[in-house]
Amino acid sequence: MLSILWNLAAFIIALGVLITVHEFGHFWVARRCGVRVERFSIGFGKALWRRTDRYGTEYVIALIPLGGYVKMLDERAEPVAPELRRHAFNNKTVGQRAAIIAAGPVANFIFAIFAYWLVFIIGVPGVRPVIGEITPNSIAAQAQIAPGTELKAVDGIETPDWDAVRLQLVSKIGDQQTTVSVAPFGSDQRQDKTLDLRHWAFEPDKQDPVSSLGIRPRGPQIEPVLSEVQANSAASKAGLQAGDRIVKVDGQPLTQWMKFVTFVRDNPGKPLALEIERQGSALSLTLTPDTKSVNGKAEGFAGVVPKIIPLPEEYKTIRQYGPFSAILEATDKTWQLMKLTVSMLGKLITGDVKLNNLSGPISIAQGAGMSAEFGVIYYLMFLALISVNLGIINLFPLPVLDGGHLLFLAIEKLKGGPVSERVQDFSYRIGSILLVLLMGLALFNDFSRL
């Protein structure tokens, strides 16, 4: 319950910030163009708070925080007094109206740059993309990429950490192949390797793009050495102690902790013959895992904690810049996200990305809560990502979105007169139906993931 409330709070804050930014873009440019703004509302429905400024603009925070709007004086909506007609939106030039409409998405892009600027000034921790293991017969194995090498670039784009690698790999969905530059860790002697992506079975909502290629990042090492044995557990009853190294299980040599976990999990209530090393001496013990029900299935449980060797400092990175350099980095990062978003939307349309990858408010709320738990840096990066998505989606040429209004203005400019109200009304209805269908699909996908 607490996690749901946390996710909801983080989601509402994120939505409030991004909607305010978007609508403020419309509001600010409208004011600059001499348009009278009658209402600036965050949310829909019953007003929870309102005030009116000296220009006659009413500011509202409403009950349902799923959007917002800026209401401008417009003769098409209601009669306007003669002395105020020059302040009506419909009486402004095509260029001014286009600027007002485009200002919302542009404000979202500027906010993303600002958020990343803060992130890069604070400093972004990361891990150098050094490969720990390669899965046999995987795409990475077929490209002859070796463990211990570092991924320096993907298709010529530098990848200083794993997040950068993931961002570039996601953009390759639907492509036939991609080229990665690798080098031994600590060296810059690069080699180019070609990844064959024709049979890349990657689903963004379920998998990590790196692991789906058969690459396991170098991380903290988990040794088959016990750091803790829980009291009254199966391991304690078997005589295991902290510091014991497990050498063999049922006669099979053990070099990886996960292999021991698999043995225990798959043998509930069954004796396992262990050979261990304790303070230089070899011992033989018998472990009978306790039985626990997990999702209706019996699994073994030993009650031990392994020894974890932290990642060495030379594998860690921090991207931190001065105020001016941070602007350049933030702009570049935002541009990369914009290109990725457009690419992914295009691949949704062409079918290269499945429609079940479309996410709705529930997935966004979960992302908001998770990023907020990790800290302010990750929450800012989440806000930047959603802000870019909001800006791009609003530029789609659907009549109910900013992009649709811009399309009508472009037609008006070309033909020398506005699109007829009949055509506009029909287009709005079609656009509304399409938008509702997309939202319904996104919600269906959200619920199917729960």
Swiss-Prot record:
<feature type="transmembrane region" description="Helical">
    <location>
        <begin position="376"/>
        <end position="396"/>
    </location>
</feature>
<keyword id="KW-1003">Cell membrane</keyword>
<keyword id="KW-0677">Repeat</keyword>
<dbReference type="InterPro" id="IPR001478">
    <property type="entry name" value="PDZ"/>
</dbReference>
<keyword id="KW-0862">Zinc</keyword>
<dbReference type="Pfam" id="PF17820">
    <property type="entry name" value="PDZ_6"/>
</dbReference>
<dbReference type="InterPro" id="IPR008915">
    <property type="entry name" value="Peptidase_M50"/>
</dbReference>
<dbReference type="GO" id="GO:0009266">
    <property type="term" value="P:response to temperature stimulus"/>
</dbReference>
<keyword id="KW-0843">Virulence</keyword>
<keyword id="KW-0378">Hydrolase</keyword>
<keyword id="KW-0472">Membrane</keyword>
<feature type="topological domain" description="Cytoplasmic">
    <location>
        <begin position="125"/>
        <end position="375"/>
    </location>
</feature>
<feature type="binding site">
    <location>
        <position position="22"/>
    </location>
    <ligand>
        <name>Zn(2+)</name>
    </ligand>
</feature>
<feature type="transmembrane region" description="Helical">
    <location>
        <begin position="104"/>
        <end position="124"/>
    </location>
</feature>
<protein>
    <recommendedName>
        <fullName>Regulator of sigma-E protease RseP</fullName>
        <ecNumber>3.4.24.-</ecNumber>
    </recommendedName>
</protein>
<dbReference type="GO" id="GO:0046872">
    <property type="term" value="F:metal ion binding"/>
</dbReference>
<dbReference type="InterPro" id="IPR004387">
    <property type="entry name" value="Pept_M50_Zn"/>
</dbReference>
<keyword id="KW-0482">Metalloprotease</keyword>
<dbReference type="InterPro" id="IPR041489">
    <property type="entry name" value="PDZ_6"/>
</dbReference>
<keyword id="KW-0645">Protease</keyword>
<keyword id="KW-0812">Transmembrane</keyword>
<feature type="topological domain" description="Periplasmic">
    <location>
        <begin position="397"/>
        <end position="429"/>
    </location>
</feature>
<feature type="transmembrane region" description="Helical">
    <location>
        <begin position="430"/>
        <end position="450"/>
    </location>
</feature>
<feature type="topological domain" description="Periplasmic">
    <location>
        <begin position="22"/>
        <end position="103"/>
    </location>
</feature>
<feature type="domain" description="PDZ 2">
    <location>
        <begin position="199"/>
        <end position="291"/>
    </location>
</feature>
<dbReference type="GO" id="GO:0097533">
    <property type="term" value="P:cellular stress response to acid chemical"/>
</dbReference>
<feature type="binding site">
    <location>
        <position position="26"/>
    </location>
    <ligand>
        <name>Zn(2+)</name>
    </ligand>
</feature>
<comment type="function">
    <text>A site-2 regulated intramembrane protease that cleaves the peptide bond between 'Ala-108' and 'Cys-109' in the transmembrane region of RseA. Part of a regulated intramembrane proteolysis (RIP) cascade. Acts on DegS-cleaved RseA to release the cytoplasmic domain of RseA. This provides the cell with sigma-E (RpoE) activity through the proteolysis of RseA.</text>
</comment>
<feature type="transmembrane region" description="Helical">
    <location>
        <begin position="1"/>
        <end position="21"/>
    </location>
</feature>
<dbReference type="GO" id="GO:0005886">
    <property type="term" value="C:plasma membrane"/>
</dbReference>
<dbReference type="GO" id="GO:0004222">
    <property type="term" value="F:metalloendopeptidase activity"/>
</dbReference>
<keyword id="KW-1133">Transmembrane helix</keyword>
<dbReference type="InterPro" id="IPR036034">
    <property type="entry name" value="PDZ_sf"/>
</dbReference>
<feature type="active site">
    <location>
        <position position="23"/>
    </location>
</feature>
<dbReference type="Pfam" id="PF02163">
    <property type="entry name" value="Peptidase_M50"/>
</dbReference>
<comment type="similarity">
    <text>Belongs to the peptidase M50B family.</text>
</comment>
<dbReference type="GO" id="GO:0006508">
    <property type="term" value="P:proteolysis"/>
</dbReference>
<keyword id="KW-0997">Cell inner membrane</keyword>
<feature type="domain" description="PDZ 1">
    <location>
        <begin position="115"/>
        <end position="186"/>
    </location>
</feature>
<keyword id="KW-0346">Stress response</keyword>
<keyword id="KW-0479">Metal-binding</keyword>
